[in-house]
Amino acid sequence: KKLLAQAGFPNGMTTDLWAMPVQRPYNPNAKRIAELMQADLAKIGVKAEIKSFEWGEYRKRMQAGEHQMGMLGWTGDNGDPDNFLNTLLGCDSAKTNGSNVAKFCYQPFEEVVQKAKVVSNPTERTKLYEKAQVIFKEQAPWFTIAHAVQLKPVRKEVIDFKLSPFGRHTFYGVDMK
């Protein structure tokens, strides 16, 4: 409430909160998450109206920056930090139709991520991406609320089946007892 008052909203404020109309592994019930967020926001004086659209329309409008607050998620498909940090927070991705729907473009972050992209030394690259994560959390263009847990039922006769962190099913080396 104090920060809202300092920002010029001593009596609170109103906003839209867009809820995804689809289920995703990282957010299986966006409407319920939106309701919980709405309740938390109300406690500090922010009245949030939940809105949703058909999925194609939702994504189009989010990418165009029409939202005030909205939900999206990401499932990294290659394990490289660039696939998250640059794709979702980089300046080039902030353009219309990009994946950076927060339209976040902060040069100190951008410089670190662009440098990390081309550094071949793994230790230096790790340090740069760690620095980028600190900047992301300090600037807070959006916040993370969940991480998907993968569960795959496998019969007890199946041996050496391993879950891929990328959601792929690799059967190399898999066998039956």
Where are these regions (language model features)?
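Glycine-rich phosphate/diphosphate-binding loops that line cofactor/substrate pockets in enzymes
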Residues: 8-10
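Short, well-ordered beta-strand elements
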Residues: 12-24, 49, 68-69
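Structural transition elements
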Residues: 1-6, 24-32
